Design a protein with these regions (language model features):
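Mature extracytoplasmic/periplasmic domains
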Residues: 296-357
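Extracytoplasmic ligand-binding site segments that recognize negatively charged/polar headgroups
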Residues: 109, 114-256
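Ligand-binding "clamshell"
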Residues: 124-131, 149, 155-159, 269-281, ...
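Periplasmic-binding protein-like
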Residues: 226-235, 273-297
Length: 383
């Protein structure tokens, strides 16, 4: 059997690329902890794997969930099955781009999927999602209005998605290596930090940094603006130690770099491991990402899907997920249950709304613009 191999340390975060934003998720131990001791039903379909539930439910009720690797506390799955009698059939993916064609093909009728903001938009535009019956999701009341409003950037009428987890992209810096205030993307072009800057190895993330530093939208499709951003990234390239994925976490914890572009959930973990690290959302603004729960149009267990979504919106369950994953929850009541005050009041996990005023979610820009972005990125990397 081919499976996602987990890291040895359960605290090592996010080993899969979350495109375009490149967020990293742990490869799950879920398969080993939950299914290895039990009888395993493994269905191989177009290169993917669906894992059979081990709860022993004989009612036939089930919900088929397709989620990022280790993006849920596995105990929640057990609790949901025990409390509802609904078996959870669980499959994981590494990127939105792996997930999308599998949902689009309809070969497996997934009931719940967790795409990123821009991918929700794409799935809506391509008529792949069912409207959620919110009468079956009463716990939606615990999702803060601000996140429902933000989600309108990709789901304009809030018909198809429920915010699950969210975060920001910013700069993680070492206070002992950086001797000036960090409040702007411009510091990533300071020659003083040559060979001590880490950039995300992701086309949209890299362009977001450059576009925002120039005062443009990170969703720009203006060719002149994109060309200006390309030139800025080429100018920066001699200063960059590495274009990285999950290595930014390890390098910053190990004092191997002074500055790194990173995701807020990763930054929170890094700061716990190295108290010399600080995180900031630059004043020009950044990417605010939201991963959302949706129901594909061909789902065969829609009511069970809504029951599962409702369960994840329960405050105590949201709190369990935060403790396990350390990415921000949009659930205000769940946040109040976080015992660790430093985490509950963390400015990284829960920044003040004023810090988000110039932030944007990524939009799906269309296939033609994706080609343009990728071509410009190749030009940058080849210099």
């Amino acid at each position: 059997f081919l499976v996602n191999m987990p890291p040895d340390d359960p605290k090592v975060k996010k080993a899969a690329v979350h495109a375009p934003a490149g967020k990293f998720r742990k490869f799950s131990r879920f398969f080993f902890h939950r299914f290895a001791p039990a009888a395993i039903m493994l269905v191989i379909v177009i290169g993917g794997f669906v894992y059979g539930s081990s709860s022993g439910n004989m009612s036939g009720e089930k919900v088929i969930v397709y989620n990022w690797g280790d993006y849920i506390d596995p105990e929640i799955i057990t609790m949901f099955e025990d409390e509802t009698g609904i078996d959870v059939v669980y499959e994981e993916y590494e990127t939105n781009e792996i997930m999308y064609p599998k949902v689009q093909s309809g070969a497996i009728a997934y009931d719940v999927v967790c795409p990123s903001d821009y991918m929700v938009q794409r799935m809506i535009e391509n008529d792949l999602l069912a409207e959620i019956n919110y009468e079956n999701v009463p716990n939606l009341k615990y999702i803060d209005d601000i996140y429902m409003e933000m989600s309108k950037q990709y789901d304009p009428e809030n018909k198809y998605s429920v915010p699950y987890l969210w975060g920001t992209v910013g700069i993680l810096y070492n206070k002992k290596m950086v001797d000036e205030p960090v409040d702007s993307w411009n510091i990533l072009w300071d020659e003083k930090y040559t060979d001590s800057i880490l950039m995300q190895d992701s086309v949209r993330d890299a362009f977001a940094v450059a576009l925002k530093s120039l005062g443009y939208s990170l969703n720009s499709t203006d060719l002149d603006e994109l060309e200006a951003a390309k030139k800025l990234l080429i100018k920066q390239k001699p200063l960059v130690q590495a274009y990285v994925i999950d290595q930014v976490r390890d390098k910053m914890i190990g004092n191997e770099a002074a500055l790194g572009v990173i995701y807020s959930g990763e930054a929170l973990y890094c700061q716990k491991e190295n108290p010399d690290l600080e995180y900031v959302i630059p004043k020009e603004g950044s990417n605010l990402w939201i991963d959302a729960l949706v129901i594909p149009k061909n789902a065969q267990n829609k009511k069970n899907a809504e029951a599962f979504i409702n369960y994840l919106c329960r405050p105590d369950i949201a709190k369990m997920n935060f403790d396990y994953i350390t990415y921000s929850i949009p659930n205000s009541a769940g946040r109040e249950l976080i015992e660790d005050e430093s985490m509950r009041e963390s400015n990284i996990a829960f920044p003040d709304i004023s810090q988000l005023k110039n932030c944007e979610t990524f939009n799906f820009l269309g296939d033609e613009n994706e080609i343009i972005y990728n071509q410009l990125w190749r030009e940058i990397k080849s210099k």
